[in-house]
Amino acid sequence: MTMITIDYIKDIIKRSDKLSEEIDPDQTPYKSKYEAIELLVKELKKEINENEKELNQQQQQDILDYLVVIDSKLGELFIATEEITLGLNICRDCLKSLESIKNKFPLETISTFQSIAIIDINKNHFENGKQLLIKSENLINQTIEKQQEQEQEQEQQFKDKLESLQLQNYFYFAQLYGLLKDSELSSKYCELTLRKQLKRNNFDRLEWCKNSLMLAEYYLSELNFDYAKQCFLVSNYICKGIENEDDREETQANIYLVMAKFYLEFLHFFRDIENLNHCHRVNNNNKNNNNENDIDFVQGGLSSISLSDKQKEKEKEDKLFNENQIKKEKMLDLISFNKRSLNIDKPLFTELGSELLDKIYNHSTFTSPIDLIVVKDQPSARDIFLKSQHFFNKSKKYYKLDGFVSQHIKILFDQINLFEYLNMFESNAGRKIGIHKKKIELIQPLLKELNPTYFLSSIRSIYFKIAEIYSEISKIYQCVCTNLREIQTYNECLFKSMEYYNLFLNSYNDGEVPNSPKITEEEKMKSIIEDFEVYINAKLELAVCHKNVKGVNKLVLEHLEKSLNLFRSIITLLDSVPKDISSRHTQEYHLCSQMSSLLPQKIQFLSSNKTPNPGQWYGK
């Protein structure tokens, strides 16, 4: 019989730990872990039970403490071999005892906290998982602090294991807060994970780049362009060390995508600033162009605008201008780019060393500098636009339509947004229309390529977007309609918009889209409710398009009647859906009710004997 000693127990546990870390072939994936279990159960626990009576009281207490540790390790081994219920029960059973000796066995206690926490998180027991991770984090910090205070010379193996557990805790926290939709805390722990991995210099480069690019996107959402830039530049450096060529190419394409979005979101921000300026300019133009008398299309008479009404209107415009100025100031306070304090004094990823960081940030491999300028006019907007477009096009070389349909379409829609942001800074009507047509050219060819059986949702998005673009073009032509030819061009844009809105709406009907799957009436209503926001907007926009048609009375009347029917159908639809859905669309309901009341009067007015002859053009 072997005389049981603490050193003997430690030796068996060390052998078991070594076995548990072995990576076995796919045919026998858990061979080493089962050997570790056998070592702990058959050899160690058996020896302890046989020698228990020969030990003094202190030895017995020490052995009991180690039995708790052995049980916790067994629980983790069973979890690792996918016997999760058994392993979880063992870990939970020994957790209370383990917490009582946590100062003696901090690493084992932390590891058990984490094992239970990640299972709870995977089962959506987020609060339980969160509390265990907090306990784990506190114990990690206490252990590090204790080491520093007492200047303990711990084994390197202990320090490495503690750092590894700290890294794992950061990673689990990042996952947890991601699932809880707390992007701020998730990003905080993601950053800590990335930095700890760089410090340890032992990490999967592919996963590191993925997480770093996710962090970059978070910083873009927070308008922190300086930190976003640091994330993708360091990812670009790390990416070069990915050994697998396919993985490296995919990661490089994702880096280009984030860089494209870097410029896209920057232009988006200044588009919003310009939009506030534009609102004020439009109000001023309207004020200057207002006539004192306005024609009422129903009564056919004149209505005077009193001085008090003008004063109220001016006060309203002044108030709006002041509100917009405050909004602009707040927005400009939020944005961060080209700030020395973030790029020099507080850079991310200092673990790489200042010399290497300087090389990465200031001497990157890209042909042109990755910099930003304040967007004030069309030339500066175009500069940002071209840089974003450049990186979108580079990413599309990897994310081709053949093989990456969803991602390719997503990139095209991002490019459409890019064109839209540029258009805000364009003052020439012809160039504005040209930009809109470029947007259509990007996505219209996809309608011939996509199979509705698999990509019906994408096809609907394309229908809706093209309809929206033609509607925007019609608004530009509407401002310059002075003769028959211009009115005809204006109407053609409206008719194109109607065509695509109808294609979108009809796609919810069985058999309307070629090769689309058959659906029942119940399935149709379900799909409408799933897309209710965009569906109701499409119907509303279609009704407005019909209402805005210009030309001879016969044509106008025909489209006014269609418009009226659509407004009424929207009311019927909103009355038929559940209350929680209809309550979100009270504004649309009110507008449709107003139109259902006003349009019959307009139709009657145009049809009455007072109207000009049938060949008369109506452009009101």
UniProtKB/Swiss-Prot annotation:
Pfam families in UniProt: KBP_C (PF12309)
Keywords of the record: Coiled coil, Cytoplasm, Cytoskeleton
Coiled-coil zones: 30-64, 133-169
Any GO BP annotation: mitochondrion transport along microtubule
A cellular component term, taken from the record's GO annotations: mitochondrion
InterPro entries assigned to the protein according to its UniProt record, in alphabetical order: KBP
Cytoplasm as UniProt keyword: yes
Chief localisation class: cytoplasm
Protein localization: Cytoplasm, Cytoskeleton
The organism's place on the tree of life at top rank: Eukaryota
UniProt family annotation: Belongs to the KIF-binding protein family.
Record function comment: Activator of KIF1B plus-end-directed microtubule motor activity. Required for organization of axonal microtubules, and axonal outgrowth and maintenance during peripheral and central nervous system development.
Protein name per the record: KIF-binding protein
Organism: Dictyostelium discoideum
